[in-house]
Amino acid sequence: MPRNVIIAIGVIFFGIIAFDMMGIIVRLLGDTYPILQIAAMRNFFGMIPALILLAHARQFAALPRLNQPRLHAINLLRSTSVVVAQLSFYTALTKIEFATAGALGFSGPIFITALSVPLLGHVVGVWRWSAIFIGFAGVLTIMQPFNDGFSAYMVLPVIAAFCYALSSILVRLYPQDMPSAAIQLGQQIMTCVLATLAMLVFFDPVAITGASDAGLIVMMGAFGGTGVMCLVIAYRLADPSSVS
């Protein structure tokens, strides 16, 4: 296995741990704050890892390079898909068992492999297609759509997985020499704006109650931002279909 693929897989595992920590906090906050407010706060504080990396590498000069019509379109599509994913997954975390939501969320690699064919022109062999079909069979086994225990909320993590996969695939369309932290910061700003606007339209924001909630919100953003940063780095290191 190529060294870059091994490194990318390791980075993704670290990102998965960060996402799990974020998910636990989202579940804790979900009974108090509207989901869109949680998404807006998560995206605001999710800028922290990107800012730290940009400062450490002294790469802030790369940010103006994002100001291109083509990159604006990619960023808007990525950000919109992420907001939909967050709304879907965060809602699921508050409505179904954490383990079930997490397991269904792991269907992301299935969508990444499938989407890499039309969007990136990758060739996926028969073994990977077989893995995709087996993966979908596993998703259906968990959901049990024709069982009495099925809940429509179980569809939400799968929608989230598809949207996160789309965002991950689109990151390959950025120039290879563009710093990953710059890409991530641009996306975090846009997702924060979109989630905040949606929150103001559909919900009344709830005041943050106490230092403990404030601390959880900051950690949620930091974990989430770290997780997404890991995905951006991993899928730029190696072909998404190979890593997935």
PLM regions with names:
Residues 89-91, 108-130:
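C-terminal transmembrane-helix exit sites in multi-pass transporters
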Residues 41, 101-107, 174-190, 228-244:
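Helix-helix packing/entry segments at the starts of transmembrane helices
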Residues 127-144, 160:
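Hydrophobic transmembrane alpha-helices of multi-pass small-molecule transport proteins
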Residues 29, 38, 42, 92, ...:
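Hydrophobic/aromatic residues within transmembrane alpha-helices
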Residues 7-15, 62-88, 152-160, 199, ...:
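Loop-to-transmembrane-helix transition segments
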